[in-house]
Amino acid sequence: MEQQPEGLHHERRVLARTVDRVMRPAATTVDADESALVAWELFERSGSSHLPVVRPDGRCAGLLDRADVAVACAAPAVALSGLRVEDLLRGHGPVIVHVAQTVRHAADLMTCTGTDAVPVLGEDGRLVGVLTATDIVAAFAGHPAREEPADLRPPAPPTLLPPPPPRRGYRGTAVP
């Protein structure tokens, strides 16, 4: 099926937009020297899939993915006690975009690096937001950029199930 001309023009307009018109503001961040458990708690409270990581001087150290933290938190508690957020970041420098860059540039960068989200830096080099693949798709669909404050987001579903009831008669003993 051939694409209609107005659809093609819309796509070109979206790709030519600057990132700041499509991204969402960074409402929640995590310090690079925080523990992995603190990062997990922030993910749970915010309901986000990505957390920007900032260094003590305010520079962006990268973007933490919820799945990476979930894998790390599956480790024994002893191993978790010394695990820092910065340890969870991938070994290379952060993949970032700047507010004045185009959506096309960001989409190309995300495709080449295999990421589904990137931190967005302002003109001063400080973190101003996060751009996700969902944000780009929403822009193509004509939806406005999302600006959900953390307190208006639906609560994240609980990740821990209640413990199973005790077994009765296990190995010849009964639970009172």
Predicted feature locations:
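Short hydrophobic/aromatic beta-strand element in the GNAT-like acyltransferase core
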Residues: 50, 60, 117
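Short, conserved beta-strand edge motifs with alternating hydrophobic and charged residues
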Residues: 52-54, 63
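The conserved cystathionine-beta-synthase
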Residues: 29-47, 54-55, 96-114, 120-122, ...
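Short active-site-adjacent helix-start/loop capping segments
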Residues: 38, 60-62
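Tandem CBS (Bateman) regulatory domains
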Residues: 2-25, 65-115, 127, 132-176
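Generic detector of bulky aromatic hydrophobic side chains
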Residues: 14, 22, 38-40, 44, ...
